[in-house]
From Swiss-Prot:
Localization per record: Secreted
Similarity comment text for this entry: Belongs to the glycosyl hydrolase 27 family.
Binding annotation for substrate: E225, W226, G227, Q228, A229
Protein name (Swiss-Prot/TrEMBL): Probable alpha-galactosidase B
Catalytic activity: Hydrolysis of terminal, non-reducing alpha-D-galactose residues in alpha-D-galactosides, including galactose oligosaccharides, galactomannans and galactolipids
Signal sequence region: 1-25
Swiss-Prot/TrEMBL keywords: Disulfide bond, Glycoprotein, Glycosidase, Hydrolase, Secreted, Signal
Lineage, broadest ranks: Eukaryota, Fungi, Dikarya, Ascomycota, Pezizomycotina
Catalytic residue positions: D155, D247
InterPro entries: Aldolase_TIM, Glyco_hydro_27, Glyco_hydro_27/36_CS, Glyco_hydro_b, Glycoside_hydrolase_SF, Melibiase_C
One of the GO BP terms on file: carbohydrate metabolic process
Entry EC no(s): 3.2.1.22
Purpose: Hydrolyzes a variety of simple alpha-D-galactoside as well as more complex molecules such as oligosaccharides and polysaccharides.
Amino acid sequence: MTTFFSLTTAAAVLTLARGSNALVRPGNVGKLPALGWNTWNAFGCDIDATKIMTAANEVVNLGLKDLGYEYINIDDCWSVKSGRDASTQRIIPDPDKFPDGISGVADQIHDLGLKIGIYSSAGLTTCAGYPASLGYEDIDAQTFAEWGIDYLKYDNCGVPSNWTDTYTYCVPDPGSKATNGTCPDNKNPAPAGYDWRTSLTAERYRRMRDALVSVDRTILYSLCEWGQANVNDWGNETGNSWRTTGDITPSWPRIAAIANENSFLMNHVDFWGYPDPDMLEVGNGNLTLAENRAHFALWAAMKSPLIIGTALDSISQDHLAILSNKILLKFHQDPVIGRPAQPYKWGYNPDWTFDPAHPAEYWSGASSVLGGTLVLMLNSEDTTQRRTAVWKEVPELKDVLGRQGKRRIGFRVTDVWTGKDLGCVRDHYSVELESHDVAALVVGRAC
């Protein structure tokens, strides 16, 4: 069902949450992290209505819709590249790619019980050089609403010089000469105490937020500003999710580096606001099955948006099984607990080490729906290694252990990947993990 709201609710859209303003939308849109599919990682600019409807139908036929995946998102390259309509100033859908327009595709997607997303950028052009929305926020938001759009991914390309920030924020991606989470090559840092909410980047994204909340349709707002301008200070009051890094690629070094960066941002995760480590690469490139598992498990545990980016009509059963893991999806979509899993021990490194090659290896998170605590153990090394979860080290288990005093107890443990009951496990659980694999457990009631 499509959710609408009147202009009178726009003034009330910012609501106090977690001690800061969060973008709260009608119908609980954006309260939980988004689940869906996007064209970019699979097809880049090679898109059309047929490919998008194929994906939408596969989301239904493969059972992904029943698991909560609902957004079918069109990324860059959907419009006429030469410019806007001269009389209306509206962006024009490419008639060769979309003969029935975007609204025609939206109608078909809605008929499947799914939602549709679109893409633009907070600049003059998109990353692929198509018309973007800076200076046209109101007309574009109105156009998207009229087409039946439910989700906007808003990129950070095509920014003119008069909208460039005064200072440069440190995003410690590999390749930026980052050192332990710092950027020593940054020659234009902001002074101490600088409020990044006053930056031009923040203003560009606020303008589209304000345009979206002024239309009579609820559109989820996904910021894609690549972690710039200290977005963690203002992202939650501006959008429903915000990118924390540069783009992902289907390679383990990049996935590990993003997981490492995002692991330090878990205090920003709760209902209505989600740091976004970028779309999923499950099923793409030359990732091993273990790496696909680790990628998905970490993204789900961090309660990141889970946006599939592979061709669903040719997906393997192994990759589909990863994307369909009911236990991880239940944790991700918990209606009572908004907080994510968090690292409780780094494992390979001393705790709180910033290491793009070796992110935190031990994670845990409370759940209201799993009957226990989610525990992950990652092998970030390049060879098979043994990993051990010690119950007394897991924060969510300490209260139970403390109440038992010196009595030696165990916990009922379930393997998340197989669903197998591993029995009553006392003190600790050990497992041999191949390179870049992850063990995922639900540690349940005491026994």
